[in-house]
Regions:
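An amphipathic alpha-helical interaction segment
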Residues: 97-165
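Basic/polar phosphate-binding segments, predominantly the helix-turn-helix DNA-binding elements
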Residues: 161, 166-193
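Ligand-binding loop in jelly-roll beta-barrel domains
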Residues: 65-95
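Generic protein-terminus/edge-of-domain signal
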Residues: 1-43
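A generic beta-sheet turn/junction motif
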Residues: 31, 47-49, 74-76
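ATP/adenylate-binding site constellation spanning eukaryotic-like Ser/Thr protein kinases
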Residues: 32, 40, 75, 105, ...
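Short acidic-glycine-tyrosine-enriched beta hairpin
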Residues: 49-64
Length: 193
């Protein structure tokens, strides 16, 4: 488990991070929830529950202790919020790609300079509180691909993910499984939505 950026008693903190093309972070988790807001580039987030693609202007929400790995395409500029899971009772409970609203984007930018300790009732506290409110209502986007349960399909998906630059033809993959392309399409649709 990675060390978190939150100081004791801190509800959230924001960190600006840039990643070069091709960078990867191996599987890890955090004690805090995490919102990764992508400003440029593309990020693929992999968890045991599936994969999420996060383009610019979007974010990915990761609940506390979610094991995840990251793969970066293009020069990625990101703003990452680390959020105390107890800061709000109704924070999202599952990994999801979300739309970063213009209000949330500006609040994230404003939160970059907020220290761990700040005056109660001041501007910094109001920004933090408003971010926490906005996290509860982020629009969810359908940019995930769950892993299939069927072991044959899961093996095919893992092979394709590991060799993403290869050109896979539906009929070729289907024949390796001993089924038709149409059957493969139906099974994949049934398993992954």
């Amino acid at each position: 488990m990675h060390d978190d950026f939150l100081a004791p008693g801190q509800s959230l903190t924001t960190v600006a991070i840039d990643y070069p093309h091709g960078a990867e972070e191996p599987g890890h988790s955090h004690r805090s929830c995490q919102l990764i807001h992508i400003l440029s580039g593309l990020v693929r987030v992999t968890t045991p529950a599936g994969d999420w693609l996060v383009p610019p202007g979007r974010g990915v929400w990761l609940p506390a202790r979610t094991v995840h790995s990251l793969k970066f395409t293009g020069h990625v500029r990101a703003r990452t919020l680390f959020v105390d899971p107890l800061a709000r009772a109704d924070l999202p409970a599952q990994c999801q790609v979300v739309q970063i609203t213009p209000l949330l984007r500006e609040l994230i930018n404003a939160s970059l300079g907020i220290p761990a300790r700040f005056l109660s009732g001041g501007r910094d506290e109001r920004i933090i509180e408003l971010i926490l409110d906005e996290l509860r209502i982020m629009p969810i986007l359908p940019l995930n691909l769950p892993d299939p349960v069927d072991l044959q399909l899961l093996a095919v998906c893992k092979e394709i993910k590991q060799n993403i630059a290869e050109n896979y033809e539906l009929e070729q993959v289907a024949s390796q499984l001993g089924i038709s392309g149409r059957t493969l399409s139906r099974r994949f649709q049934r398993e992954t939505g």
